[in-house]
Amino acid sequence: MKIALVCPASLPATQFGGIVFLSIDLAREFSEMGHDVTIYTSDLDFANGPTKFNKDLPRLEKFEKFKINRTHTWFSVKLYFVNPNIYKQIKNDRPDIIHTIGLRSFQSLMAWFVSKQTNIPLVVSDQGGLTTHPFLKQSGIFFKLVYKIQNFFIKCIINDSSAISAANEYEKEIFLTFNKNSKIKIIRNGINLKTLVSQENFKQKYKIDNKFILFVGRFSKSKGIETLLYACSIIKNELKTQNVSLVIMGVDFGYQDEMLKLINMLKLNDNVIVIKNPPRDDVIAAYGQSEFLVLPSHWELSPLVP
């Protein structure tokens, strides 16, 4: 079977988060089963920031047993990446089935257009962006209007889909608010343990002598880093614990400057190690050597950490 996986970002932009890992894992598993799998995506690369696109990335790249088809992003608004040529690429390749991930994306809109025009079955998944995202409540009038327009198209995509894959019962209920008759199957997110092996000595590389607690994620207000730093301050000042460090690994999504100021204000510079834009291998190595991982997010749908 010829399978098209459609998503806003893919390799090498691992810092984008769960959608990247979900699509890669699906592509890996489907291709191992003998299917012809292509990921259609943007050319986001995260080399210099969360909205940096790279024309030098291969347009078509073979990775393991599947392919990644990248088209250039003309412009972006927040995490909405507009790469119109993705429509032509999917349509010309004539897949047997299209599976799109991340319904607030331009890429899902294009996948729906192709499906509707060619009668190719459409499977949809999301990864936390439908109704629970804090941007929906915190944004100004313009973006609230944009989200309402998006909701119209999301409802169309859901109504026309052949099947919906939800990560858990909570996400299933969110989908049902758009269409009570949706064909929903709960397929929980998994982790490929083979990808969680690293030869890197993380503590040696970053000169960490203490035991450390680990946070991995976007530097975003919604990830709860502020709460984590105040907790770290309590551990240091009230519990008088000096031999444990906090390692924060991730990429800036608008909160980095405020986070660094808070670290300085709480006098945690000697206790907190911030690693910006870490290589994936370093992240995996950190998982193995940390005492434990913390997930202080204000909300999560079905987190793909690690």
Model-predicted segments: where are they?
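N-terminal subdomain of nucleotide-sugar transferases
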Residues: M1-K55
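Nucleotide-activated donor-binding/catalytic signature segment of Leloir-type glycosyltransferases, i.e.
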Residues: E258-D281
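Short alpha-helical donor nucleotide-sugar binding micro-motif in glycosyltransferases
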Residues: N277, A285-S290
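Carbohydrate-associated surface elements
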Residues: Y170, G190
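Glycosyltransferase donor-sugar binding loop
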Residues: F46, I191, V216, S245-L260
